[in-house]
Amino acid sequence: MEPYALTMHELHDLLVRKELSVTETLTSFLTRIETLDPRLNSYLSVLAESSLAEAGRFDRGERDLHASPLAGIPLAIKDVLCMQGTVTTCGSRILENFVPPYDGTVIARLREAGAIFLGKTNMDEFAMGSSTENSAYGVTRNPWDRERVPGGSSGGSAAAVAADLCSGSLGTDTGGSIRQPASFCGVVGLKPTYGRVSRFGLVAFASSLDQIGPITKDVEDAAILLQAIAGHDRRDSTSVDHPVPDYRASLREPIKGLRLGIPKEYFVHGMHPEIADSVQRAINVCLQLGAEVGEVSLPHTGYGVAAYYIIAPAEASSNLARYDGVKYGLRVPDARDLIGMYRTSRSQGFGAEVKRRIMLGTYVLSAGYYDAYYTKASQARTLIRKDFLDAFDSFDALLAPVAPVPAFKIGEKSDDPLQMYLNDALTLPASLAGVPGISVPCGFSGEGLPIGLQILGPHFREDLLLRIAYQFEQATAHHLARPDSI
């Protein structure tokens, strides 16, 4: 089997046993990227020279392959994470030449673990989108059907993993941007608890929602990646100093006796019937594994979309105010005055969806509308969080669909922002509540499109989610499927 087709843990075993060199491994991936990625556009930049140089250090014995399970492993990084000396665009024209002078915390931790960075992946501009159609650098295509979207905003990261263009990747999840593309592309995607992973070096969209997490080929790989990046960071004031368990240690524990809740509000009217069928079959697998299953209500789920699309744009309008053409980013030439330079740089640098959300956020924060919109949205968020806390009093975890439909056609929802936003209805509540969630492959539609099972758990119980997902994965074969032709 080619190195690019292996999981991270399989690949690392071969590297440690010297059955493969790290240079051979990197060459395998780089050749595949050169051949296939022009059809997918999952990468915005490929770091061939630096990655091969790092591989050489391992092969010469200058770095130790035994140092960690990530030593010598080729990863892709969503282009919203600062990497020293590497262009970081956030999928936006306004940052097309921005080179960060430092590594974000997760990048620094992965470097220390010995991971090798293949490149930066495409994304919806500033992580605002659900399809990776909003990138200033072109749409990313789904490896299972190149006429369809890979999901978003971490679509490039998910597509790269699904197409074997990296061993694993990092994405970010503000309202579903790891879980939904993982579902659409048939891979594993984990959104950790808010505060579990440092956001230092993450270009902010909505600071109270953004979270970094792994996208991988299987659950064990997700545990390995999370192990490397989780933990307190004093440079991030929202990082929580909470013990980090050994995420691989509990993977093989049976789930017999666990109480799994099925939120009735997540099986919405208009859901694609094959989604509901696949999730029901996944629930039956968990029953066969000895779990106890029961219905639960999350009564304020219906307010999630409205609350999110008030809170997130409000935070974005503040965070994106820094892009004015003065310190960094696009600056238009020949502006007549300072205000004209601000206006023209921002209007030319930002795409349509980003402008829409900035305007929405500015509106809901304005004096006459703050109480009517932002305050009520914050109250709804509190109620949604309480729904989850109440549910976890009775259940260990929740099982649900990730999205109401499989991957949709490119351009199908582009002219209807509301329909695009509603596609996030099943992932937004967990983001608003700050609880962890994982998407694991659980089936395929009649058209051969992947479908994901969403598992949600209490704050800081990523270990439990990984255990449930792993046991489900071992009882099924959905995660082993790969696109036939790209």
From Swiss-Prot:
It comes from the Bacteria. One of its GO terms (molecular function) is glutaminyl-tRNA synthase (glutamine-hydrolyzing) activity. Its EC number is 6.3.5.7. SUPFAM superfamilies: Amidase signature (AS) enzymes. InterPro entries: Amidase, Amidase_CS, Amidase_dom, AS_sf, GatA. The active site is at K78 (charge relay system), S153 (charge relay system), S177 (acyl-ester intermediate). One of its GO terms (cellular component) is glutamyl-tRNA(Gln) amidotransferase complex. Keywords: ATP-binding, Ligase, Nucleotide-binding, Protein biosynthesis. One of its GO terms (biological process) is translation. It catalyses: L-glutamyl-tRNA(Gln) + L-glutamine + ATP + H2O = L-glutaminyl-tRNA(Gln) + L-glutamate + ADP + phosphate + H(+). Heterotrimer of A, B and C subunits. Belongs to the amidase family. GatA subfamily. PANTHER family: GLUTAMYL-TRNA(GLN) AMIDOTRANSFERASE SUBUNIT A, TRANSAMIDASE. Allows the formation of correctly charged Gln-tRNA(Gln) through the transamidation of misacylated Glu-tRNA(Gln) in organisms which lack glutaminyl-tRNA synthetase. The reaction takes place in the presence of glutamine and ATP through an activated gamma-phospho-Glu-tRNA(Gln). This is Glutamyl-tRNA(Gln) amidotransferase subunit A.
